[in-house]
Regions:
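Bacterial Sec-dependent N-terminal signal peptides
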Residues: 1-23
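Hydrophobic alpha-helical segments, especially transmembrane helices
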Residues: 3-4, 30, 95, 104
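Low-complexity, intrinsically disordered short peptide segments enriched in small/polar/basic residues
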Residues: 6-9, 14, 45, 59, ...
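Alpha-helix boundary/capping residues
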Residues: 11, 52, 69, 101, ...
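Short S/T/G/P-rich N-terminal loop/turn motif that feeds into the first structured element of a domain
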Residues: 16-80, 89-96, 122-126
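Surface-exposed, polar helix/loop patches in the mature regions of secreted/periplasmic/lumenal proteins
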Residues: 83-126
Length: 126
């Protein structure tokens, strides 16, 4: 019985250590896509783009930031035109970002411009 318990402990410990190593080899991508209400002027859109870009300098949990405008010839973007990608080291960092005062201030800048918003998070290997 003691050997069985010891074996189970070693097996669980090994699995836990490997899971932690795998998490350290990954980065969390947080993708936000916006579509705009008809008639939204470029000044309002530029204000959102600028405010989103400033978050990287205000919230140190953000490891990388990039953005772009849709140029896919497939016409499958469903009205979403602007795509922003933030990179985090962990889900905990992403979660802290979501409640960060600077992120909340950014969300206030959004109103009332976007018509559509989609958010997708996923893990990638480093």
């Amino acid at each position: 019985m003691k050997k069985l318990l010891l074996f189970a402990f070693i097996l669980i410990s090994s699995y836990t250590m490997n899971a932690q190593k795998d998490e350290q080899k990954q980065l969390l991508k947080h993708v936000v896509m916006f579509g705009w209400k008809p008639g939204t002027d470029t000044v309002a859109i530029d204000k959102v783009v600028s405010a989103f870009g400033n978050l990287e300098h205000k919230i140190k949990l953000i490891k990388a930031y990039e953005w772009g405008i849709n140029n896919s010839p497939e016409n499958l973007n469903n009205g979403l035109t602007h795509c922003f990608t933030l990179t985090f080291s962990s889900e905990a960092d992403r979660d802290a970002y979501l409640i960060h005062p600077d992120h909340k201030a950014f969300v206030a800048v959004l109103s009332p411009a976007p018509d559509k918003v989609t958010v997708v998070d996923y893990w990638v290997s480093k």
